[in-house]
């Protein structure tokens, strides 16, 4: 029996609140059950040094967790003086995922930075970050079109991400913390709206998984992402 009696292919309740803060060009509070992430998009009229004069833009991301986003207080990474390996891995994943939805040449020589700050963690923070940051990025880019900075939108479509895994021998979708901590296999899947995969990260924490189980997990991810795309579209239509 899953927490809250969810079906194996059923994500947690998804809530996407746009324009959550007033200063950023795009801001979203995304909620997957008890996991809550604030995603903001900032537009800069410059690009990193390695892209100067190349005629294309850049999309990057930063990720962090507030000290009491978890059961016990975490020390701020700023207090430690450096980012942890997990943080760097996650923000690179977020950035790669979001670059897949943007024509960087059409964006022009400007950058969009997505800041993803976890305010409450109950599993799936990186996938929630990608899902929310996608909507924040769309709002920021649409703002460039609306104010005449861009004449053509560089957006290619929606991006969503979800966790899947095997818990007590059963493949399931959108793991919360109690499931994630007990999973024999843990996987994160990032997809485009048209069904193409951007990234698949999978690890057997215990018993190795079979090819058939891999296909089952990918199918669960596809079903879960379909519901996420619906939630994103509904939020953007509001």
From Swiss-Prot:
Q: Which residues bind phosphate?
A: 86, 124-126
Annotated GO MF terms: 3'-5'-RNA exonuclease activity; tRNA binding; tRNA nucleotidyltransferase activity
Q: Which GO terms describe its biological process?
A: rRNA catabolic process; rRNA processing; tRNA processing
InterPro entries of this UniProt entry? ExoRNase_PH_dom1 (IPR001247), ExoRNase_PH_dom2 (IPR015847), ExoRNase_PH_dom2_sf (IPR036345), PNPase/RNase_PH_dom_sf (IPR027408), Ribosomal_Su5_D2-typ_SF (IPR020568), RNase_PH (IPR050080), RNase_PH_bac-type (IPR002381), RNase_PH_CS (IPR018336)
Q: Name one Pfam family in it.
A: RNase_PH
Q: What UniProt keywords apply to this chain's record, in alphabetical order?
A: Nucleotidyltransferase, RNA-binding, rRNA processing, Transferase, tRNA processing, tRNA-binding
UniProt catalytic activity? tRNA(n+1) + phosphate = tRNA(n) + a ribonucleoside 5'-diphosphate
Say yes or no: keyword RNA-binding present: yes
In short, the EC number is: 2.7.7.56
The function of this protein is: Phosphorolytic 3'-5' exoribonuclease that plays an important role in tRNA 3'-end maturation. Removes nucleotide residues following the 3'-CCA terminus of tRNAs; can also add nucleotides to the ends of RNA molecules by using nucleoside diphosphates as substrates, but this may not be physiologically important. Probably plays a role in initiation of 16S rRNA degradation (leading to ribosome degradation) during starvation.
For this protein, the record's NCBIfam families field holds: RNasePH
Name the family the entry cites.
Answer: Belongs to the RNase PH family.
Q: Which PANTHER family match?
A: EXOSOME COMPLEX COMPONENT, EXOSOME COMPLEX COMPONENT RRP41
Q: How does it assemble?
A: Homohexameric ring arranged as a trimer of dimers.
Under what name is this protein listed?
Ribonuclease PH
Organism ancestry: Bacteria, Pseudomonadati, Pseudomonadota, Gammaproteobacteria, Pasteurellales
């Amino acid at each position: 029996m899953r927490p809250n009696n969810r079906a194996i292919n059923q994500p947690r309740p998804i809530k996407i609140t746009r324009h959550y803060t007033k200063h950023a060009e795009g801001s979203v509070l995304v909620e997957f059950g008890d996991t809550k992430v604030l995603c903001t998009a900032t537009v800069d009229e410059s690009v990193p040094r390695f892209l100067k004069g190349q005629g294309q833009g850049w999309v990057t991301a930063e990720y962090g967790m507030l000290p009491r986003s978890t059961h016990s207080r975490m020390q701020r990474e700023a207090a430690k003086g450096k980012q942890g390996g997990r943080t760097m891995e996650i923000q690179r994943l977020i950035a790669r995922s979001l670059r897949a939805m943007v024509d960087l040449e059409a964006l022009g020589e400007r950058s969009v930075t997505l800041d993803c700050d976890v305010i409450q963690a109950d599993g799936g923070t990186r996938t929630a970050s990608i899902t929310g940051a996608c909507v924040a990025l769309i709002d920021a880019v649409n703002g460039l079109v609306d104010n005449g900075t861009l004449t053509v939108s560089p957006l290619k479509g929606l991006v969503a991400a979800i966790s899947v895994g095997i818990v007590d021998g059963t493949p399931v979708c959108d793991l919360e913390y109690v499931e994630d901590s007990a999973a024999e296999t843990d996987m994160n899947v990032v997809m485009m709206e048209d069904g193409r995969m951007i990234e698949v990260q999978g690890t057997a924490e215990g018993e190795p998984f079979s090819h058939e189980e891999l296909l089952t997990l990918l199918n669960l991810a596809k079903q879960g992402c379909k519901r996420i795309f619906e939630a994103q579209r509904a939020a953007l239509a509001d």
